[in-house]
């Protein structure tokens, strides 16, 4: 089992991993989105954090699932001209999940606050996906887009040698067997040879020697 002490603090808070110690304030098991968020928040509060991962690379399921999050009525929706409200979300969740009302209300009350905190205290940046319907678009309270947020691509070379520690996306999300692409690149790649704009976009992707995730 591999472990990285304060790994999230290094990447997100600009700190270097601390030496292994005998005691920690917070121990996080798993390096997916939930684990990394927990570690980053604890580190931002000056807690000594140990992040433990059983795999040889970090990222968990999040790394192979696109890294998107579902945050209803988020403050970023206005960037793409969309609007939402918690009452509509509440109706949608009441028709789709069987979780307790208490947990649902906690999610509704704090999910947007959570992403605000992460963007303020870490280098994570998210953007709304305008056309990404809820899984059950015909149910009451569903929307056709905006609730899903995706991470803004960044230059993977900033991680240096630690880039190799990241779990790779699925092959379907990579070009030429190893070049990572974003969701917005896919329509352009499908139109190569049919659209000058898309062809130029694809050529820039290939010519770009940066690693991006």
Where are these regions (language model features)?
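Extreme N-terminal leader/targeting segments of oxidoreductases
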Residues: 1-26, 44
């Amino acid at each position: 089992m591999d472990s990285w002490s304060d790994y999230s603090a290094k990447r997100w808070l600009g700190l270097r991993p601390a030496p292994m110690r005998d005691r920690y304030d917070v121990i996080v098991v798993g390096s997916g989105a939930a684990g990394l968020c927990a570690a980053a928040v604890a580190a931002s509060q000056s807690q000594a954090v140990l992040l433990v991962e059983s795999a040889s690379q970090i990222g968990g399921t999040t790394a192979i699932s696109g890294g998107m999050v579902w945050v209803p009525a988020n403050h970023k929706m206005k960037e793409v001209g969309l609007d939402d409200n918690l009452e509509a979300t509440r109706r949608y969740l009441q028709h789709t999940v069987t979780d307790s009302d208490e947990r649902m209300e906690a999610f509704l009350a704090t999910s947007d606050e959570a992403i605000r905190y992460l963007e303020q205290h870490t280098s994570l940046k998210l953007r709304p996906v305008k056309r990404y319907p809820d899984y059950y678009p015909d149910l009451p309270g569903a929307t056709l887009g905006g609730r899903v947020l995706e991470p803004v691509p960044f230059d993977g070379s900033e991680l240096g040698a630690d880039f190799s520690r990241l779990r790779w996306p699925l092959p379907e999300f990579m070009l030429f067997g190893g070049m990572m692409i974003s969701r917005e690149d896919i329509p352009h790649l499908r139109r190569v040879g049919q659209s000058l704009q898309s062809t130029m976009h694809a050529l820039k992707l290939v010519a770009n020697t940066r690693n991006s995730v």
